[in-house]
A protein has these predicted regions:
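Conserved class I S-adenosyl-L-methionine
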Residues: 63-73
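A short glycine-rich, Lys/Arg-flanked "PGG" loop and its adjoining helix->strand segment in the class I
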Residues: 153-165
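Core SAM-dependent methyltransferase catalytic element
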Residues: 193-216
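Conserved SAM-binding motif I beta-strand of class I
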Residues: 90-95
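Conserved beta-strand signature within the Rossmann-like core of class I S-adenosyl-L-methionine
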Residues: 165-173
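Class I SAM-dependent methyltransferase Rossmann-like catalytic core
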Residues: 23-25, 29-62
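Conserved SAM-binding loop of SAM-dependent methyltransferases across substrates and taxa
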Residues: 74-86
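S-adenosyl-L-methionine
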Residues: 101-132
Length: 216
C-alpha cells in the first residue's frame, strides 16, 4: 500500500470511529430515547448537577435498603444515587424503554444496580420479585402531564403503596400538574423549584407519614 493510499484510508476510519464513539455516548443514547418515545422522556436535555443534589438532599441515606428510580434514561440520576447508596443497599431502575435498560446494564458496573424493563405502575410486583416488601424512596422524572389517561393516577397510587412509612416519593417535573396525581395518596407534600436546569424544574417530595398506619 502506498503512503497516499494509507492517508486516504485514515480519513474514513477516523470518521467511523468518531461516529461509533458518539453513538455510544450517554448524550446520543438519551436523544435516541427521547426521539423514540418522547411521551415517556421528560426532556431532551439531562438534569443538571444542581437539580440532582437538591432533589436527593432530603434522603436519609443511612436508612436506605432499597431505592427505586422510574425512567432512569442513561443514568443521569442513577450514578449520583449509587454514589450515595450504602454498600448493602440496592437500586432498582425501571424503564419502559429496553434500549435504556440495556445501556445501563452494560455501562454501569455495580452489583447494587438492578435495571428492569417494565412499567412504574407495576413497581410493587417488581420490588417483590427482587426480594423486597417496600422501597425506602422512589425517584421519578416521568412526565406525568403527558402520560396516557389513567397512567399517572395508577403510578401515583402504586408508588404510595410501595413506599414504607417514613419514606418519600421524589419527583422532578417541568409542569406542576404532577401534584394532582400524587396528592390523593401521600400525607405530606413539599415543593421546591430549581432554575439552574434546562428547562427549570419543579421538585416535589411526597412523604408517607407514620401516622398513616392507623388509617391503613
Amino acid at each position: 500500500m502506498t503512503a497516499s493510499s494509507a492517508r486516504t484510508l485514515k480519513g474514513p476510519r477516523r470518521f467511523v470511529r468518531r461516529v461509533a464513539h458518539r453513538a455510544n455516548s450517554p448524550q446520543w443514547q438519551f436523544l435516541r430515547g427521547f426521539l423514540k418515545n418522547p411521551v415517556m422522556v421528560g426532556s431532551v436535555i439531562p438534569s443538571s448537577k444542581v437539580l440532582i443534589d437538591k432533589m436527593l438532599g432530603p434522603v436519609r441515606w443511612d436508612e436506605v435498603k432499597l431505592f427505586v428510580e422510574y425512567g432512569p434514561g442513561v443514568g443521569t440520576f442513577t450514578r449520583p444515587v449509587l454514589a450515595r447508596l450504602p454498600a448493602d443497599a440496592k437500586l432498582i431502575a425501571i424503564d419502559t424503554n429496553p434500549d435504556f435498560i440495556d445501556y445501563l446494564s452494560k455501562d454501569i458496573d455495580d452489583e447494587r444496580l438492578i435495571a428492569v424493563a417494565g412499567s412504574a405502575a407495576d413497581v410493587q410486583k417488581i420490588i417483590e420479585a427482587h426480594g423486597f416488601g417496600h422501597a425506602d424512596y422512589i425517584l421519578s422524572g416521568l412526565p406525568f402531564s403527558t402520560l396516557p389517561p389513567g397512567v399517572g393516577d395508577s403510578i401515583g397510587e402504586a408508588t404510595a403503596k410501595a413506599i414504607r412509612l417514613g419514606g418519600a416519593f421524589l419527583v422532578y417535573q417541568f409542569s406542576p400538574k404532577v401534584r394532582d396525581f400524587i396528592a390523593p395518596y401521600f400525607e405530606r407534600i413539599e415543593r421546591g423549584f430549581e432554575w439552574i436546569n434546562v428547562p427549570p424544574a419543579t421538585l416535589f417530595w411526597a412523604w408517607r407519614e407514620p401516622e398513616a398506619q392507623a388509617a391503613e
